[in-house]
Amino acid sequence: MPEPTMPDDLVRLWRLRNGPRLGRPAELDIDRVVDTAVRLADEGGLVAATLPKIAAALSVTPMSLYRHIGSKEELIGLMADAAMGPAPDCSSEATAEPNAHHATGGTATRGDATESASPAWRPALREWAVAQSEVFRRRPWLAQLPVTGPPRGPNAIAWMDAGLRALRETGLDWAAKIGVITVVGGYVRQAFTLDRQLAESRGAANVDERQALRRYVRELTAVVDAGRFPDVTALLGSGLFESVPDAPESADQDFAFGLDLVLDGVAAAVER
C-alpha cells in the first residue's frame, strides 16, 4: 500500500524538501516571505502584512508569492508559527524557583507564596503561561489570528511539548493534559485580548484607567437601583475603583490573579 502523500502546506510549514534542488538557489524563498510578513505585522499590525505590501517590500509581484506560500490562509499559519518563536524550557528543573514575579513585573502576589511550596508542575506551567503572554505583548497581532485547529508547525509543536512536559509528573492522562494546556493557553490569550481592547477603548476616549473607572462608578451609581442590584450597588460604593494602580501594574496583577485561579483548578484535577 503506497504511503500517503504529505500535504504541500505541511511540507512548507516544516521546511521539508520534495526532492533534490537543482541549479542556483532562488532569490526568493519561503523564509524571506515569512520573515518579511512577520516584520511588517510587527511594525503595523496585520493590516500592514497584506500580500501586495509584502510583495512591495520584496520588490516582487504579489502573484509570485504564491509559489512559496500556497495561499493567504497558509501565509497566516506560517506567520503564526514563525512569530511564536522557540518554546521556553518549562521542565521542573528549569523552574525550580518561583516564577510568579515574571508575570507581575517584580510585584509580589499570592503566587509568590504558593509557588514556593507547590509541586514542580505548577511553577513550570506558570512559566509556560507567562512566556506566552510575553509573546503576545511583543506581537499583539498574534492574538488576533483565528484558531483553526490543533498545533501543526514546528514552533507550535514545541510549545505544546513544553506544556505537556510541565505536566509530565502529574499523573494526569493525555486527555486531561491536553485539556489543561488548552485552558491555560486560552486564558493567556483571552486575558491579553481583553486588556488590549480595554486599553484601546480608553485611548479612543482619551482617558486613563483611573478616569475610566471613576466615570464608570459615577454613571452606574446614578442608574443602578439598590433594591434590584444590591451586590453591584455595594461594589460601586466599596471604593475599590478609587484605588486602582497604574495601568501596567494593574494588568499584571489581574493576569497573575487569574492565572492563579486557573492553576488552582489544575491542582484540584491533579489531586483527585
What are these regions (language model features)?
Residues M1-K53, A57, G70-E74, T107:
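Basic, helix-initiating cap at the start of DNA-binding domains
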Residues M1-R17, Q197-R272:
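C-terminal peripheral helix-coil segments that are non-catalytic and often amphipathic
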Residues R32-R39, E43, E74-C90, P123-A131, ...:
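Alpha-helical structural segments
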Residues S59-I69:
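Short hydrophobic/aromatic patch on the recognition helix
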Residues M79, A83, A87, V188-F192, ...:
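Hydrophobic recognition helices of helix-based DNA-binding modules
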Residues C90-A158, W174-K177, I181-V184:
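Hydrophobic alpha-helical connector segments
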Residues A162-Q211, R215-E219:
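A contiguous pocket-lining binding segment that forms or flanks enzyme active sites
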